[in-house]
Structure formats: C-alpha cells, structure tokens
C-alpha cells in the first residue's frame, strides 16, 4: 500500500530536521570561533604550566642554549656559506682536450 500524499501544510522531518537546522546554525560558529577557543585554552594551559618552577627552569636553560647557538653561528659566518662552489678546473681542461 502506498503512503497517502503529503499536504502542503504537512510538516515532516521531526528530530532529524531539527538537528540538521541546529547543526547548520552551529557550523559557522564552530568554524570561526573554534580556533579562537582552542588558542585561548592552549594559552590558559600554558600560563598554568609556566607558573611551575620545575618547568620554568629547563625552559630557560633551553632558551639560553638556543640563543647562544644562534649567536655563535651568526658571528662565525663569513658569507661564503651562501655562495656556489667554484667550478672544477680539471673538468674544464678535459673539455678543452676534447675540442682539439
């Protein structure tokens, strides 16, 4: 037996339709506010962790070591590190011999 034809005023969808409407309404909120909420939660957790001296001391040591390494590497650089290697002279000589 076929179901009766639906009337123009007949509302179907029930719970599934309601959830779909709520989901569509929440999607832009989650999309735009989600990263902000995640970042604020991470910053709050980081702020709570940084109060602990057991984690603050090793972080300071690591930061000092990284800064020292960066400054030493920067100071000893003489500018040759970015230049291309010089062409090999032995290859040039072989090319000249082949042409003769």
From Swiss-Prot:
GO terms for cellular component: plasma membrane. It comes from the Bacteria. GO terms for molecular function: metal ion binding. The chain crosses the membrane at residues 19-39, 43-63. GO terms for biological process: response to mercury ion. Hg(2+) binds at residues 31-32, 82-83. The keyword Transport applies. It is found in: Cell membrane. It is a multi-pass membrane protein. Keywords: Cell membrane, Membrane, Mercuric resistance, Mercury, Metal-binding, Transmembrane, Transmembrane helix, Transport. Involved in mercuric transport. Passes a mercury ion from the MerP protein to the mercuric reductase MerA. This is Mercuric transport protein. The gene is merT.
């Amino acid at each position: 037996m076929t179901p009766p034809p639906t009337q123009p005023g007949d509302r179907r969808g029930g719970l599934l339709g309601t959830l779909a409407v709520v989901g569509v309404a929440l999607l832009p909120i989650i999309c735009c506010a989600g990263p902000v909420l995640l970042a604020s939660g991470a910053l709050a957790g980081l702020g709570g962790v940084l109060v602990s001296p057991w984690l603050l001391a090793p972080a300071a040591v690591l930061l000092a070591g990284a800064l020292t390494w960066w400054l030493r590497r920067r100071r000893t650089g003489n500018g040759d590190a970015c230049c291309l290697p010089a062409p090999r002279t032995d290859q040039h000589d072989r090319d000249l011999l082949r042409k003769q």
